[in-house]
Design a protein with these regions (language model features):
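Core catalytic region of metal-dependent phosphoesterases/phosphodiesterases
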Residues: 2, 15-113
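Short, hydrophobic/glycine-enriched beta-strand segments
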Residues: 2-8
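Short, flexible active-site-adjacent loop segments at beta-strand->alpha-helix junctions, enriched
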Residues: 9-10, 82-83, 107-109, 121-126
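Active-site-proximal loop/helix segment associated with metal-binding centers of metalloenzymes
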Residues: 11-27, 116-140
Length: 140
């Protein structure tokens, strides 16, 4: 068993937002990810997917991206990113994902070797220049 990590896939199989709008280097980015993933990752490996998996705004729009991810080899641990507006609740997302995808949201995922991955939302310190009233409620 090996552990890999990747983030910000920004897949768009369910919406019309190809990554190549950001430049020619992004042409075929999903194919490049698939080729690299499928040639390196085995069914015994685990992959931390650090958020921003899909450009979809709803679960329906993100579903083709989640299906694509489920087709990749290995066990995937998926955490919600700041662009994951489609991730409305654990129950709703769990209902549509492949068994090889494990959701991480204020919980933990134990891997077969005893490694435990813990996930929770990151909160910026209250003195951060971008902190706002919502952040203030967390600390007071």
């Amino acid at each position: 068993m090996r552990l890999f990590a990747i983030s910000d896939l920004h897949l768009s199989f369910g919406v019309d937002k190809p990554m190549d709008i950001f430049g020619d280097q992004w042409v075929g980015h999903a194919d490049k990810i698939r080729e690299s993933w499928d040639s390196r990752i085995t069914e015994d490996d685990w992959v931390l997917v650090g958020g921003d998996t899909s450009w979809g705004l709803s679960l329906q729009e993100a579903r083709p991206d989640l299906d694509w991810l489920g087709e990749r080899p290995g066990q995937k641990i998926l955490i919600k990113g700041n662009h994951c507006t489609w991730w409305t609740s654990l129950a709703k997302v769990r209902a549509v994902i492949d068994d090889s995808i494990h959701l991480l949201q204020n919980n933990a995922v134990a891997m077969p070797d005893g490694t435990v991955v813990i996930g929770a939302r990151l909160w910026d310190p209250p003195e951060a220049p971008w902190a706002d009233e919502k952040s203030e409620k967390i600390y007071n």
